[in-house]
Structure formats: C-alpha cells, structure tokens
C-alpha cells in the first residue's frame, strides 16, 4: 500500500511543498522569512477576523467601536494590538525577505520575483487601508493626503480621487469601502503567495553561494521545518514583547484623537514602514514627480534582474557590491528617519540627497560594481 502522504491528491501537494521538498543543504537563517511571512499572514487574518466581528465601518461609530473592542470585548485589547503590531512584524519580515533576495541574487528567478513585487504592493495597500479604519486623526488625514496624490495624474486625476472617496472628501463611503477592501485583500494575498510558491518550486530555492545545488539536496522535513519553528518562536516572542510591554511604541499618539476634518494635525505621517517611500515622495517639489518617485521606489525592484551585470549570482564573494548593499540599507534607514521629521531645513536636503542615492545605487552603482568585479576576476 502506497503511503497516503504520497498518493492522496491533497496530501501529495502538501507533501511536495513542505515535507519531501528537495532543499539546498546550505540555506541560512535568511531563508526563514518566507515561512515567517506566511505565519504573519495567518496571524493577521485570524486576529482581523475577530476584530471585524466587533468593528463598525461607520464614521460615527468606528472610533468608539475600536475603544469598545479594547475595553469591553474579552481579550479584545490583545487581539487589537496583535493585529496592529503584527503588521509591523509583517513588514520587518518583508523587508528582510526582499533584502535577502537582493543580496543573494534570488531576483534571477524572474517570475517568483515579479509576483513578490506584486505581493509587496498588495500588502502595502492592505496596510494603508487598515490604518484608516480606527478613524483617528492620523487615520483620516493620512487617508486624505495619500488618496489626494492620485489627483496628480493628468486629466483623470481629480475624477479618480472623487471616485475612490465616493464623494467630495474622505467620509462614510470611503471608510466603508476601505473596510471591505481591507477584509478581502488578505485572501487575495494568500492566493498570490500560493502562486509565488508555485513558481519558486518550479526552479527550487537559491542558496547563499548562488550556485546550482541540484547535486546536494536534503528533504525539507525535518531539517527546515525544525529551523522554521525556531524562527517562528523568535517571531512570536518579539511580537508578544511588543504587544504586552509597549503596544503603542510604533503607533502615532494622534490616532487616539477621533477624526476631525476641521483640525489638521501638525505633522501628518504614515506608519513607520511607509516612511522611506514618504520621504522620497516629499523630496521632490513637483506633485506628479513626487508620486512617480513614490511608485518607482518599489517598482524599481522589477528592473533589477535586467541590471544584473556580474558573472556571479550572489554577493557572497563580491565585496564591492556588499558595500553598496549595506549603503542601501543605511540609506533606507536614513529615509525612514527623514520621513518622520517635519518638512524644514536640514531635513529637506538630507531627504533629497538620500533619495538621489537610493535610485543611484540601483540604477548606476550596482551595475558598475558588477562590471568592475568581473574585471577583477580576470586578474
């Protein structure tokens, strides 16, 4: 009798994806973030589902329904803060995952990489809409500022913004539709993640050395399942430390003030994970130019496979490219800091320089370093 794990149609899919999957024998902890993102998505869907049972998407009651969840619902406070801080953990894992892909040349799997970029856009859209739902000051003004950016699109901009708003300002219709989209998008993300995995399993995983590992594979279970469980424990520990000791550390105090269209907060800023893109947006004085730079700050990832000039896939043995990679990390941290600062001197200049450096690293410096390293190999 054949093992049910290998014969049953459903069990066979799970077996080939998580149990008998041939995996490279040398993949490091940087390969843990894919599974951690899956765990984050499950946590977000479950906590979000329970929050949706008590939340009301109406401008009059949204803020008080969130207060009600925290005060009156059994363990509502922990569900709410796990959801809010779970989003932060999600983005930490996402940035690490993308950084790993950049460092080790995983972007040469173009289909997997491009679906990953699509996933990133979808996750960012979901997080943005989720931030609007508590209907605090920063929720309302964040929604107003970010949706207003679409008015920079020539000819159709203004109509498009009013169509998204469902009126002439961010109001009840906007909140209701944002809640509907915020609810459905995680399931679309799940489907995209399955396609992401499907394409990944067509080629097999990359590994730190960047060379083919077909001659040296090990089964995913028990080796990498055990390793992933360790990653999961660390993730849960970090999330619960955040939730139980400083749940509002990454939030904005302005969001504890109910939304008021007549009173603008002194500094409108998005959640921390969007600050780098927000800084790039603000560094360009022209509205349309800023919006284009904002979109390109993520979309630039799509052309990275075309700009790969090195004969080696991974940066493991490429010191010049390694320096540029860590310069990029430092630049992103600088942009994140600038995004949270007021628009005044010297922050404007620092933001503009950091934005120029961000695009220069991808478009000019990385390809040049690849060519130089190829030359050095001939010596």
Curated annotation (Swiss-Prot):
Q: How does it sit in the membrane?
A: Multi-pass membrane protein
Q: Which residues bind a ubiquinone?
A: 201
Identify one Pfam family in the record: Cytochrom_B_C
Q: In its keyword annotation, does this UniProt entry include Transmembrane helix?
A: yes
Where, in this chain's numbering, is heme b b566 bound? 97, 196
Q: Report keywords, A-Z.
A: Electron transport, Heme, Iron, Membrane, Metal-binding, Mitochondrion, Mitochondrion inner membrane, Respiratory chain, Transmembrane, Transmembrane helix, Transport, Ubiquinone
Q: One GO MF term, please?
A: metal ion binding
Q: Which GO terms describe its biological process?
A: mitochondrial electron transport, ubiquinol to cytochrome c
Q: Membrane spanning segments where?
A: 33-53, 77-98, 113-133, 178-198, 226-246, 288-308, 320-340, 347-367
Residues that hold heme b b562 according to the record: 83, 182
Q: Entry's SUPFAM superfamilies?
A: a domain/subunit of cytochrome bc1 complex (Ubiquinol-cytochrome c reductase), Transmembrane di-heme cytochromes
Cofactor names: heme b
Superkingdom, natural source: Eukaryota
Note on how the cofactor is bound: Binds 2 heme b groups non-covalently.
One of the record's GO cellular component terms: mitochondrial inner membrane
Q: Where in the cell is it found?
A: Mitochondrion inner membrane
Principal location: mitochondrion
Q: What family name appears in the similarity comment?
A: Belongs to the cytochrome b family.
Self-association and partners: The cytochrome bc1 complex contains 11 subunits: 3 respiratory subunits (MT-CYB, CYC1 and UQCRFS1), 2 core proteins (UQCRC1 and UQCRC2) and 6 low-molecular weight proteins (UQCRH/QCR6, UQCRB/QCR7, UQCRQ/QCR8, UQCR10/QCR9, UQCR11/QCR10 and a cleavage product of UQCRFS1). This cytochrome bc1 complex then forms a dimer.
Q: What else is known?
A: Heme 1 (or BL or b562) is low-potential and absorbs at about 562 nm, and heme 2 (or BH or b566) is high-potential and absorbs at about 566 nm.
Function description: Component of the ubiquinol-cytochrome c reductase complex (complex III or cytochrome b-c1 complex) that is part of the mitochondrial respiratory chain. The b-c1 complex mediates electron transfer from ubiquinol to cytochrome c. Contributes to the generation of a proton gradient across the mitochondrial membrane that is then used for ATP synthesis.
Instruction: Please give the PANTHER family that the UniProt record associates with this protein.
Output: CYTOCHROME B
Protein name per UniProt: Cytochrome b
Q: What is the lineage of its organism?
A: Eukaryota, Metazoa, Chordata, Craniata, Vertebrata
């Amino acid at each position: 009798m054949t093992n049910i794990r290998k014969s049953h149609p459903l069990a066979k899919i799970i077996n080939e994806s998580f149990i008998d999957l041939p995996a490279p024998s040398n993949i490091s902890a940087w390969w843990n973030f894919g599974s951690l993102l899956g765990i984050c998505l499950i946590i977000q869907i479950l906590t979000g589902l329970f929050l949706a049972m008590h939340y009301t998407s109406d401008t009059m009651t949204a803020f008080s329904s969130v207060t009600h969840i925290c005060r009156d619902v059994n363990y509502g406070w922990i569900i709410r803060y796990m959801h809010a801080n779970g989003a932060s953990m999600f983005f930490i894992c996402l940035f690490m995952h993308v950084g790993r892909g950049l460092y080790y040349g995983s972007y040469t799997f173009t289909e997997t990489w491009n679906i990953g970029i699509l996933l990133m856009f979808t996750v960012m859209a979901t997080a943005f809409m989720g931030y609007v739902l508590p209907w605090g000051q920063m929720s309302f003004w964040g929604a107003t500022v970010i949706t207003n950016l679409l008015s920079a699109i020539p000819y159709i901009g203004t109509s498009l913004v009013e169509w998204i708003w469902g009126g002439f300002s961010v109001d009840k219709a906007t909140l209701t539709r944002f809640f509907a989209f915020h609810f459905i998008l995680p399931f679309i993300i799940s489907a995209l993640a399955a396609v992401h995995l499907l394409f990944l399993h067509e080629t097999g995983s990359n590994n730190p050395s960047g060379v083919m590992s077909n001659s040296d594979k090990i089964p995913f279970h028990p080796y990498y399942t055990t390793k992933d469980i360790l990653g999961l424990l660390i993730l849960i520990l970090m999330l619960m430390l955040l939730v139980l000791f400083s749940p509002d550390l990454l939030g904005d105090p302005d969001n504890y003030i109910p939304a008021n269209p007549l009173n603008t907060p002194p500094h409108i800023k998005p959640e921390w994970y969007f600050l780098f893109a927000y800084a790039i947006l603000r560094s360009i004085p022209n509205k349309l130019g800023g919006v284009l730079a904002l979109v390109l700050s993520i979309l630039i990832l799509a052309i990275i496979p075309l700009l790969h000039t090195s004969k080696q896939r991974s940066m493991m043995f490429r010191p010049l490219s390694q320096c540029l990679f860590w310069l990029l990390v430092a630049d992103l941290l600088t942009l994140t800091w600038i995004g949270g600062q007021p628009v005044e001197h010297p922050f404007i200049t620092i933001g503009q320089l950091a934005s120029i450096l961000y695009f220069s690293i991808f478009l000019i410096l990385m390809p040049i370093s690849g060519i130089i390293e190829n030359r050095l190999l001939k010596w």
